[in-house]
């Protein structure tokens, strides 16, 4: 059939199927399965742990891409040698299922969150057995069908898979199971299967400890585990370029292009974008409806497309060649021709396509079928002067391809491959595979690029593995899909390709006004930490159009007004949309305007920077006039809802909307109003009618706000309650951070469908480095920076923060009994900054590299130290020049 349906847009966040669940996750250096803890064990486990002096011991990244299970949780039925499947195991495992007997089942534990392509090596079989495998992140959610919701974007559409076993072979799952700790193997049909090995081919980022450019270590084992759990959570959500397997495979000695809806089922060769004149020859066998191929393709969404409809095609015109121009996913017919004879399914045919100048000729089994003149295309069609080749099968269409050869106009072989072995697949970007690196929201679900999640994930990346390319490419994809209104979509499939043509018509798309604005905040954060001005320049027009669209949503009060059911959704997808003047949305808009001003300055547009600054100032005034409630001392949910919102008040403090004199009161009232569970704050007061779920995403903003405001004690309490709970031993511990938490009992908040490795929950990683260790950029690319530790009850912390100029390392110790603080800062070349050291009062003494620079409230310059002042319990020292600054206070 011809181009009937495009991939449906992303539905609202989360799983709309069976009951949702969250998962308890974390830190997995424990290779044993989680079990019920006895009283004696509990006493041992709650003693203060010994903190290692080597931060590398906290890193959880799999050492090898072939991940093996570490323990057998249980077996039922006739199972022999289950432990032989574990890491380092020898021998084999046999499962036997008789018609009258119990089905054999093995529940395996991989020790922590992992994900990729499950595989099973069968060494023997008897009868006609069917192997079945199910997957779960948390142990309590394992069922015969796995743990619930599969992703709507990338990955296997089911949490279990079945495989008819025909004989000895390694069975590899065709699609990714992106996140699981537990795997249940059974037989669903009678027979016997002997397995010599099972495992998962890990496909996410696998940066080892040696590649971590940022690291953190403190006197608190819990905080250390939280930091590295956040870093590993991020890694499970990072997908390297071309790592997603796509929908193609090698079957029966040929490339099997089973129908896909991603990128309309099209995939292209990873070379040849500059090829102009050539002949591409291949053999094809239609298995259902049609066989499609592309020529002069720039990517799967741009090029010439040809489709052979077989004699039984149910959606198109049987025995027809369709010819189309595809531009940014829009299809325009440039011709069609009846085939000279019927084309039967299951028969092999040879196709030759010659592109030369403005002509395209197609031969079928050596017989000319048609010639297309691309200099005289119909209205709406786009001509392509160069590009590579590819194949396309959409939906339930299916065809096989082999013996591909591409020869240039002068007779040179450009590419030749029989397409009979799996080694051929990496030459292509098939539908479902990703041409560029990207960051997903969750390892299991949704497995999509989400702009709001990137705001947290980007910071986690910059402070840990420091692979900003994942963030950059994700933002590039989002920006390329901007609508004509200026609205930037908030969610994309990771296999999406960049939009190359004019802006797509429309006012709004997935997901909401806030997720559209997050693009600006994400880009500003990327620029602040990387200094990549070239990328800012490229995206600057996108920023301008986005902020122009935001301005169209201002109401008569000068506040952003959203529409429920149109653009009023936000992070709490399980609650109803919010319409009207929503406090949190307006505060995010305020931040977007400030970020827009910073990006305008980077792009050299100083007048626009000034305009955004003025708009932000006016918006701040209106927010405080209309949405702040002086009676409660807090910001309302909206102009129509007077309840308390965690996001609005935390963001008001963090982004400076709230006057400095009111910030301490806001944080105090916020704790009194919402800190009512042992697992962290409720995101809304009970009168708002929202679900009783703790949000690590929103709590991350509150964590940053409290640290920025100097409320370190409550920040540490928040860290323990929310993230300490997720890393504690339990049936849902995965070594990673959960999407949300039930305020009732601390279980995963939405049931078995929840993501237990969710990047938006990793704020502590950047917060601990940025505030507790104390390293933050002041200007783009760390040209200037601040080191200001917030020690709380810690006695020491040390770590490293990567910058474009080199590492910035910090080591501090606190002796509160003696009111002494020692701080060593190693600074990168070509930078300057501020070192703020805690002091007991204005009259304290501060020494830098042996020179007294502060005593009795007065500053004295020293080598590399140019200014000093006292403020809020710190002496702030301006320093310049690379080197080591050893600073002490008493």
Task: Describe the residue ranges of each PLM region.
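Repeat-solenoid scaffold signature
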Residues: 690-724
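Short strand-turn-strand beta-turns centered on an Asx-Gly dipeptide
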Residues: 363-367, 532, 848-851
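The feature captures the catalytic groove of carbohydrate-active enzymes
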Residues: 143-149, 154, 256-258, 334-335, ...
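Structural helix-adjacent loops and short alpha-helical linkers that scaffold large soluble proteins
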Residues: 129-131, 173, 188-196, 223, ...
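Extracellular/oxidizing-compartment recognition motifs
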Residues: 40-439, 489-493, 561-562
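Non-catalytic C-terminal accessory modules of carbohydrate-active enzymes
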Residues: 713-890
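Aromatic-rich carbohydrate-recognition surfaces in CAZymes
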Residues: 155-193, 222, 226, 236, ...
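Secretory targeting and sorting signals
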Residues: 1-39
């Amino acid at each position: 059939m011809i181009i009937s349906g495009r991939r449906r847009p992303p539905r609202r966040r989360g799983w709309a199927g069976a009951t949702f669940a969250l998962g308890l996750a974390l830190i997995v250096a424990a290779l044993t399965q989680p079990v019920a803890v006895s009283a004696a064990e509990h006493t041992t486990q709650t003693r203060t742990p010994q903190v290692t002096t080597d931060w590398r011991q906290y890193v959880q990244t799999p050492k090898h891409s072939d991940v093996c299970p570490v323990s057998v949780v249980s077996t039922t039925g006739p199972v022999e040698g289950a432990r032989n499947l574990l890491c380092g195991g020898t021998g084999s495992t046999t499962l036997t299922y008789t018609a009258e007997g119990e089905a054999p089942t093995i529940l395996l534990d991989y020790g922590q969150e992992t994900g990729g392509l499950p595989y099973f090596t069968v060494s023997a079989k008897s009868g006609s057995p069917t192997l079945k495998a199910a997957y779960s992140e948390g142990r309590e959610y394992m069922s015969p069908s796995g743990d619930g919701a599969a992703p709507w974007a990338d990955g296997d559409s089911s949490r279990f898979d079945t495989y008819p076993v025909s004989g000895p072979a390694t069975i590899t799952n065709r699609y990714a199971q992106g996140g699981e700790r537990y795997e249940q193997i059974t037989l669903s049909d009678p027979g016997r299967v002997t397995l010599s090995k099972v495992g998962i081919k890990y496909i996410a980022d696998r940066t080892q400890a040696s590649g971590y450019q940022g690291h953190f270590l403190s006197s608190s084992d819990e905080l250390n585990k939280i930091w590295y759990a956040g870093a590993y959570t991020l890694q499970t959500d990072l997908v390297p370029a071309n790592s997603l397997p796509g929908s193609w495979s090698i079957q029966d000695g040929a490339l099997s292009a089973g129908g896909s809806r991603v990128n309309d089922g099209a995939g292209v060769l990873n070379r040849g974008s500059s090829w102009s004149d050539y002949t591409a020859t291949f053999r094809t066998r239609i298995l259902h409806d049609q066989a499609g191929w592309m020529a002069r393709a720039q990517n799967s969404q741009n090029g010439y497309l040809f489709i052979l409809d077989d004699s039984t095609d149910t959606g198109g015109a049987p025995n027809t060649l369709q010819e189309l121009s595809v531009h940014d996913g829009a299809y325009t017919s440039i011709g069609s021709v009846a085939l000279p004879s019927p084309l039967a399914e299951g028969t092999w045919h040879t196709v030759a396509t010659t592109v030369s100048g403005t002509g395209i000729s197609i031969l079928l089994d050596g017989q000319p079928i048609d010639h297309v003149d691309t200099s005289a295309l119909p209205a709406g069609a786009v001509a392509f002067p160069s590009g590579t080749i590819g194949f396309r099968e959409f939906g339930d269409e299916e065809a096989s391809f082999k013996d591909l050869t591409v020869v240039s106009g002068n007779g040179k072989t450009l590419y030749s491959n029989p397409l009979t072995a799996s080694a051929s697949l990496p030459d292509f970007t098939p539908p479902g595979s990703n041409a560029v690196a990207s960051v997903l929201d969750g390892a299991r679900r949704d497995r999509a690029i989400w702009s709001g999640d990137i705001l947290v994930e980007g910071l986690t990346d910059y402070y840990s593995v420091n692979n900003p390319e994942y963030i950059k490419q994700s933002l590039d994809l989002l920006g390329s899909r901007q609508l004509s209104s200026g609205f930037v979509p908030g969610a994309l499939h990771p296999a999406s390709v960049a939009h190359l043509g004019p802006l797509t018509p429309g006012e709004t798309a997935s997901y909401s006004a806030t997720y559209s604005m997050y693009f600006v905040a994400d880009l500003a954060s990327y620029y602040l930490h990387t200094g990549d001005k070239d990328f800012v320049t490229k995206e600057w027009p996108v920023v301008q159009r986005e902020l122009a669209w935001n301005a169209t949503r201002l109401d008569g009060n000068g506040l952003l007004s959203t529409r429920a059911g149109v653009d009023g959704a936000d992070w709490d997808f399980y609650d109803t949309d919010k319409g009207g003047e929503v406090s949190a949305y307006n505060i995010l808009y305020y931040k977007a305007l400030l970020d827009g001003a910073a990006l305008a300055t980077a792009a050299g547009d100083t007048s626009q920077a000034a305009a955004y600054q003025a708009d932000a100032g006016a918006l701040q005034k209106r927010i405080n006039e209309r949405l702040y409630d002086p009676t409660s001392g807090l910001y309302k949910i909206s102009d129509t809802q007077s309840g308390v919102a965690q996001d609005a008040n935390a963001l008001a403090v963090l982004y400076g909307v709230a006057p400095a004199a009111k910030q301490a009161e806001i944080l105090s009232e916020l704790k009194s109003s919402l800190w009512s569970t042992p697992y962290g704050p409720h995101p809304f007061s009970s009168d708002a009618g929202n679900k009783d779920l703790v949000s690590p995403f929103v709590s991350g903003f509150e964590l940053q706000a409290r640290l920025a405001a100097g409320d370190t004690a409550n920040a540490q309490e928040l860290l323990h309650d929310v993230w300490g709970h997720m890393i504690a031993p339990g049936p849902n511990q995965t070594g990673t951070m959960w999407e949300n938490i039930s305020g009732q009992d601390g279980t995963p908040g939405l049931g078995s469908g929840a993501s237990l490795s969710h990047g938006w929950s990793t704020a502590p990683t950047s917060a601990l480095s940025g505030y507790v260790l104390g390293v933050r950029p002041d200007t783009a690319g760390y040209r200037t920076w601040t080191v200001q530790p917030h020690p709380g009850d810690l006695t020491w912390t040390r770590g490293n923060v990567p910058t474009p100029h080199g590492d910035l390392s910090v080591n501090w110790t606190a002796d509160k009994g003696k009111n002494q603080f020692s701080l060593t800062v190693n600074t990168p070349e070509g930078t300057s900054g501020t070192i703020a050291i805690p002091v007991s009062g204005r009259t304290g003494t501060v020494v830098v590299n042996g020179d007294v620079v502060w005593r009795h409230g007065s500053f004295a310059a020293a080598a590399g130290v140019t200014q000093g002042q006292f403020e809020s319990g710190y002496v702030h020292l301006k320093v310049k020049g690379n080197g080591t600054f050893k600073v002490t206070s008493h």
